[in-house]
């Protein structure tokens, strides 16, 4: 199935516009909505993919994001706060990181699957967060970790088409030393949007 429509859920963060631009650059229709969108409204839009954006608050303060993750049958990518929402939606724990990471790049090691398919390993991921996944539920697999502080940087549901990344693919700090990947963040988003689920 060719993906035509991507719904981006805005958790009131300026990075959301970079995500919207990435999806548009890939040639897909993108619709940006507030995090208070209802399940009925999502059904009317009928998207092929959902991206849950970063944001400044906690997962419990991210509008309807946790409920959406638990109830829709559409592939979902969570970025930063969106990733944390995925962890909490399935019973995991999100808490304060030992140090705040706002505008820092870390080397990230990953499993080479899902959104990480054909991505150099490791790569630099841009980090902007003070919260982190502390405990991942059994439904989720850890897919990526930061090499400098060993924090969880990626999760994937074991059965459902749901992935999350703590780092920001859409940040200028997300890059690779490999010249074959001049825009690594765009490739990560493309992998999600074009994955066969």
From Swiss-Prot:
Residues 5-197 form the Glutamine amidotransferase type-1 domain. Pfam families: GATase. CDD domains: GATase1_Anthranilate_Synthase. Pathway: Amino-acid biosynthesis; L-tryptophan biosynthesis; L-tryptophan from chorismate: step 1/5. Keywords: Amino-acid biosynthesis, Aromatic amino acid biosynthesis, Glutamine amidotransferase, Lyase, Tryptophan biosynthesis. It catalyses: chorismate + L-glutamine = anthranilate + pyruvate + L-glutamate + H(+). One of its GO terms (molecular function) is anthranilate synthase activity. GO terms for biological process: L-tryptophan biosynthetic process. InterPro entries: Anth_synth/Amidotransfase, Class_I_gatase-like, GATASE, TrpG/PapA_dom. The active site is at 80 (nucleophile), 168 (for gatase activity), 170 (for gatase activity). SUPFAM superfamilies: Class I glutamine amidotransferase-like. Its EC number is 4.1.3.27. L-glutamine binds at residues 55-57, 84, 130-131. Part of a heterotetrameric complex that catalyzes the two-step biosynthesis of anthranilate, an intermediate in the biosynthesis of L-tryptophan. In the first step, the glutamine-binding beta subunit (TrpG) of anthranilate synthase (AS) provides the glutamine amidotransferase activity which generates ammonia as a substrate that, along with chorismate, is used in the second step, catalyzed by the large alpha subunit of AS (TrpE) to produce anthranilate. In the absence of TrpG, TrpE can synthesize anthranilate directly from chorismate and high concentrations of ammonia. Heterotetramer consisting of two non-identical subunits: a beta subunit (TrpG) and a large alpha subunit (TrpE). NCBIfam families: trpG_papA (TIGR00566). This is Anthranilate synthase component 2. It comes from Methanocaldococcus jannaschii (strain ATCC 43067 / DSM 2661 / JAL-1 / JCM 10045 / NBRC 100440). The gene is trpG.
């Amino acid at each position: 199935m060719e993906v035509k429509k991507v719904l981006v859920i805005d958790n009131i963060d300026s990075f959301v516009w970079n995500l919207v631009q990435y999806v548009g650059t890939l040639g897909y229709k993108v619709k940006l909505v507030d995090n208070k969108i209802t399940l009925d409204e999502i059904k009317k839009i009928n998207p092929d993919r959902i991206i849950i954006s970063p944001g400044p608050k906690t997962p419990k303060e991210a509008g309807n994001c946790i409920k959406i993750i638990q109830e829709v049958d559409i592939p979902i990518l969570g970025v930063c706060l969106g990733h944390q929402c995925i962890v909490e939606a399935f019973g995991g724990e999100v808490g304060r990181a030992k140090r705040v990471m706002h505008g820092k790049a870390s080397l990230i090691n990953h499993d080479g699957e899902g959104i990480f398919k054909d991505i150099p390993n490791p790569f630099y991921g841009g980090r902007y967060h003070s919260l982190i996944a502390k405990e991942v539920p059994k439904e989720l697999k850890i897919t990526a970790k930061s090499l400098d502080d060993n924090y969880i940087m990626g999760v994937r549901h074991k059965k459902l088409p749901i992935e999350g990344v703590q780092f920001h693919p859409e940040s200028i700090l997300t890059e690779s030393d490999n010249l074959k990947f001049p825009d690594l963040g765009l490739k990560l988003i493309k992998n999600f949007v074009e994955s066969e689920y």
